[in-house]
Structure formats: C-alpha cells, structure tokens
C-alpha cells in the first residue's frame, strides 16, 4: 500500500469518518479538509491545556501549513498523490488528532476519555479500562541521568516478572555503553544511577515509582551478518532485540505487577492472537525522532510523559519481509524514539495481553515488534522458566 493510500485508509477510520457514515456517505470516506484542520488545532489546544506549556507559534504555523498542503495533495490526487517527508509529517499530525491514530496522555494510569483525538477508540478503551490501568501501572521509563542522555531517558520497559522488566537490547546498550552480547549473555557495565521510573505522567506528581536497575539478567541472541535488513542496516531481524533487567527493591515502595504475555503454546489461542488487522495499543515514553516531526517540536518539553497510543497490526509474524525467524510483526501506531522497548498490547481481546515487543520503526510508514507468541521459548529461557 502506498503512503497516500495508507493515509486515506487511516483518515477513513477516524472520528469524522464515522460521522459521515451516519450521514449516508460511503463507508471509509475521509472527512472534509477544514474539519481535519480544525481537529488538529483542537488537539494542539488540548496539549497546551494538559501540560501548561504554550505551543511554539512558528512550529504550529509550519505544521498547519504542512497539513493543509498534504491534505490538498491527498484529496486532489487520491491514492496516487506524491508525498514528501514534509507532507508525511503533516499527515501524521492529522491522524494523531482526528481519531485515526491518536497519542494520548496517561493520567492516573488511564487516559482522559474527553481527549478530542480519542475518536472511536474511546469505546474500546472503556470496555477494557481495568486491564489498561493494570498495564499502564507496569510500564516504566528507562531513566539515564548522564549528560549525554539529552532527554534524561533511553526508552521504555515493562514488568515481566517479580522485580524484572523487559526492554530492548539496544536500550540496554544506551545505558551500558560498550556492552556486548554473546550466546544470550551480556558483558558490560551499567551507567551509574540508571533506573526504571513507572510514573512521570502528565497532570501532577504521583507517589514515587522509581527503582534502580540492579543487573542485567539476560539478553536476546544477536543476528548473523547475513540477516541484516537490506534497506535499514541497523536492523537485523535475525536477532532478538530483548533485554531482561532486574530492579532493586525499595523499602515501602510496592513493585508493579507483571503484565500477562501471550504464549505460542497456549492451548486455546494456539499462537494465533496477533493477526493482521487486530486492534492493539502501546504504552511508552515517546521521545526524539530521527526524522522531522513538527508535532513533537511544537511542545519541546513534554515528549517524555507516559503516553498510550492505539492502532492495528499491519502484518503478522511470517508475513514480514527479511525476517528469517518469522518472529517480527508490523503495526501502524504512532511512535517515536523513546517508545523502544514498549509492550504492544491486545486491544480487541482482553486488553492486557502483550502481543509484541516494539523495537523499531520506519518513520511515518510502519513499525516493527517481536511477536510475543513467536518468542515464547526465548522469553522463558531469559526468565529462567
């Protein structure tokens, strides 16, 4: 699917599209351009209200201009529209704001159902609200106090066992520079002061939820030289981008409960949960981006808050190119760099089962995650099960 067709499809799923269907329009018809631009401005105002941080006027003006130009091309040329990075950045902001693929603040372990960008996801999240709260409580930020960590953290982690969290190996590399892995074992030294912080939500302080990282328990095996992705040399789908970390207990501070992980040997689901089109959500700490992202630059100081972002699986494990192990799936959730290590969670089902470990994304096009049901044996081995 081309970029233009993909965004037309997403816009046809948003909140405005639902209103048009009720009025007799064809199913999946995107709403008018003025309505989408109004929704984008409403989302910017909502972020200002929630954070108390005023939007940067120049970045806001540029973003609205990019969105206007992108929508003009998209609606004028349809699925054959030519879209550059500037237009794609504008469209990504639109789908975050119109209910297609929102990025929502987590407050008190849930989202505000009044958020203007929530759209049709409000009903889905309400249905599994207790499960979502449990997941949000068990997702933390991998904090790095060193001067080279410009955002103050390196990624996201989530509780996978008693005192244990899962994240990406490349997140571990950022907090243990020079560390290497061999046969599932890590050799290296953690930076001083690194920790996992299960709070940092918008809307005020919560009880302290920070736990120092004690040690590295296990890491996923490295991929061979022959399995590097031909278009993205830093990616190697033959390797497992996983690290299990043990956290220090803190007196008087309860440790979050482990998140349920879907298993490939489950006798009921039989490894078939993470299918194409299934609704999922991701909880993490979106931070920097390797590509221009004006929506993020509008609010320079608020990128490190805990967020929840819903979406869908684009391709299930076994359908992704250059994946020799058949353990990678793709999804269309809006993500940025700090989301590395996030859990991809079932939204259509129980609202709490981890279906994937997010590890990378091709900005504005697709994101990659290890399918939980395809790494059951590896995860069991890492946890000593």
Regions found by a protein language model. Name each.
Residues 1-155, 308, 312-316:
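Protease-domain processing segments flanking chymotrypsin-fold serine proteases, especially trypsin-like
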Residues 42-45, 73, 130, 296-303, ...:
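Polar/charged alpha-helical tracts
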Residues 106, 112, 119-125, 212, ...:
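Short, solvent-exposed coil/turn linker segments
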Residues 130-147, 151-154, 158-162, 166-337, ...:
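Serine endopeptidase catalytic core focused on the charge-relay Asp
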Residues 2-42, 46, 315-329, 336, ...:
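C-terminal subregion of chymotrypsin/trypsin-like serine protease catalytic domains
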